[in-house]
Amino acid sequence: KLFRRTEFLTLNGNGKFEAYANRDSLKYRGIYGLEDIRTMYRGTIRKVGFSRAWNIFIQLGMTDDSYTIEDSESMSYRDFVNLFLAYSPNDSVELKLRSYLKIDQDDIVWDKLIELDIFSATKKIGVINATPAQMLQKILLDSWTLEEDEKDMIIMHHKFGYELNGKKHQIESSLVVKGENQTFTAMAKTVGLPVAIATLKILNKEITTPGVQLPITKEVYAPILKELEEYGIKFTE
């Protein structure tokens, strides 16, 4: 049911997205000193249609990692999909899938499946004795690997609701980072730059807190966030 329970999010200039719950969020109340709050929700943001498309894989059983499939190495993507559908001497794999899951041909979910080239009769899985989940992973890796002319994008969105002097308030804060190319990706920037900046500040004794630290103390996160703004990594409210 996880991927059926999504909420939509629109970010000006960047389009419409959807978010679904990402594991247990309650443990973060203690980490951030928010023990008394009534609601805390952490989600994953994806393009609209992702959750419905992923839920198709779940319904078919393609995410199962508990058993292996013989001759998986030589199977085509099309053969893999057909494993999870009823036999029909006349209907195509595409028609069987649409009929079984009640997907219209002009549905955005159908477009996403076509983008994966998941009905290809020539592309091979190439993984020996793989589980369904491993076979699906191979298909996704082949399709989702960033090409030279492609760029990635990372979005983080915070929504804070609070009450002050009997009046309810809400603050929304968004971070949008876009990659430059296949090498200088948004992922590389947002993962690598904070670590690099923190390392330099420790070496220069600008951060002196000893031991392994979570970046939740102001001495650690404040100077790093400030310097990240020079690289275009900043939140807007």
Regions found by a protein language model. Give the residues of each.
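C-terminal catalytic/substrate-binding lobe primarily of soluble NAD(P)-dependent oxidoreductases
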Residues: 1-237
